[in-house]
């Protein structure tokens, strides 16, 4: 059952973040916990924003931000991932360039406008 969508099913954890050609450090407390979860119908991207530093346990507070896409589609021949989002109350499919490598265990999602220089790499979780 190797439909284009089936290769994405599961949980992907961020392993690399590049902005404008510069590799950004993944601060273990927050950034490194970002995941992209692909289910049968929906896709969920959960990232964490750095919050305040907590002096009591010497940790950064991480605020979870969840984006839920009710549907998604992967067009392998185009290397595009289509995510359904809502704009002004209407559903809209946005596309992002993606690549799958290393036997479909490494997923790179490119930022639309700075595709070559801004992207995130996720690794499939067992």
Language model region names:
Residues 1-13:
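N-terminal helix-cap/turn-to-beta initiation motif at the start of protein domains
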Residues 15, 84-86, 110-112:
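A generic structural motif
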Residues 26-32, 61-64, 113-114:
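Functionally engaged cysteine thiol sites
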């Amino acid at each position: 059952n190797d439909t284009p969508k089936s290769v994405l099913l599961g949980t992907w954890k961020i392993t690399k973040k590049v902005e404008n050609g510069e590799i950004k450090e993944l601060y273990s407390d927050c950034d490194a916990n970002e995941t992209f979860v692909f289910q049968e119908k929906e896709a969920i991207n959960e990232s964490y924003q750095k919050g305040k530093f907590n002096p009591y346990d010497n940790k950064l507070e991480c605020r979870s931000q969840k984006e839920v896409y009710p549907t998604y589609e992967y067009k392998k021949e185009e290397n595009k991932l289509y995510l359904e989002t809502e704009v002004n109350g209407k559903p809209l499919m946005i596309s992002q360039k993606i690549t799958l490598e290393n036997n479909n265990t490494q997923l790179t999602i490119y930022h639309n406008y700075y595709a070559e220089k801004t992207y995130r790499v996720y690794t499939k979780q067992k």
